[in-house]
Swiss-Prot record:
It catalyses: K(+)(in) + H(+)(out) = K(+)(out) + H(+)(in). The gene is cemA. The chain crosses the membrane at residues 7-27, 114-134, 154-174, 189-209. Contributes to K(+)/H(+) antiport activity by supporting proton efflux to control proton extrusion and homeostasis in chloroplasts in a light-dependent manner to modulate photosynthesis. Prevents excessive induction of non-photochemical quenching (NPQ) under continuous-light conditions. Indirectly promotes efficient inorganic carbon uptake into chloroplasts. The keyword S-adenosyl-L-methionine does not apply. Keywords: Antiport, Chloroplast, Hydrogen ion transport, Ion transport, Membrane, Plastid, Plastid inner membrane, Potassium, Potassium transport, Transmembrane, Transmembrane helix, Transport. It is found in: Plastid, Chloroplast inner membrane. Disulfide bonds: none annotated. Belongs to the CemA family. Pfam families: CemA (PF03040). The keyword Hydrolase does not apply. This is Potassium/proton antiporter CemA.
């Protein structure tokens, strides 16, 4: 009976780890065709408004300028001009397809992640008892560690997350989250998050040391500051 009680929280922890991957894989396959049909039906009349987006418009203008340049430099026969027009038409259709695929990809990933969040939230609420057991195990494990090990672990974690060498790691992680949600890579937004998010974490961490650790374990705070210096 005791082994069963110990096994249940571990099984619950493993399910939390693998459940997002399974949900993402399942819903990606089931939602893709539905979202594609919905997008093609809905956007068939409104694409001319969306094509004003900067990236698509720049590519379209580039193709058009190449056509006009060729027409100005040489006098082509009508058959050749017709081929150029067909080429521009094909390129425009390709741009439209890429535009639609990007939007479908964004909607699909955002919907999948939203569904995954809702399911995991409900799963966490239903498994509240298992979470309490896991939390008690974690607290017992941390309590049995010496203050030196605790201070070293805190210092290592803070250096990894908010140290001077952490921006590249934050950039990779935020870029990965952006890609997972299907958003287009944006250097300005990512740079802004990288420059502000670690600062916010650093402030929260210092406040936590001041309010919590100073009250619970003053010796740990002394060791931490000694190692940090």
């Amino acid at each position: 009976m005791a082994k069963k009680k110990a096994f249940t929280p571990l099984l619950y922890l493993a399910s939390i780890v693998f459940l997002p991957w399974w949900i993402s894989l399942s819903f990606n396959k089931s939602l893709k065709s539905w979202i594609t049909n919905w997008w093609d039906t809905r956007q068939s009349e409104t694409f001319l408004n969306d094509i004003q987006e900067k990236s698509i418009l720049e590519q379209f203008i580039e193709v058009e300028e190449l056509f006009l340049l060729d027409e100005m430099i040489k006098e082509y026969p009508e058959t050749h001009l017709q081929k150029l027009r067909i080429g521009i038409q094909k390129e425009t259709i390709q741009l439209i397809k890429l535009h639609n695929e990007d939007h479908i990809h964004t909607i699909l990933h955002f919907s999948t992640n939203l569904i995954c969040f809702v399911i995991l939230s409900g799963y966490s609420i239903l498994g509240n008892e298992e979470l309490l057991i896991l939390n008690s195990w974690a607290q017992e494990f941390l309590y049995n560690l010496s203050d030196t090990i605790k201070a070293f672990s805190i210092l290592l974690l803070t250096d990894l997350c908010i140290g001077f060498h952490s921006p590249h790691g934050w950039e990779l992680m935020i870029g990965s989250i952006y890609k997972d949600f299907g958003f287009t890579h944006n250097d300005q937004i990512i740079s802004g998050l990288v420059s502000t998010f670690p600062v916010i974490l650093d402030t929260i961490f210092k406040y936590w040391i001041f309010r919590y650790l100073n009250r619970v374990s003053p010796s740990l705070v002394v060791i931490y500051h000694s190692m940090n210096d």
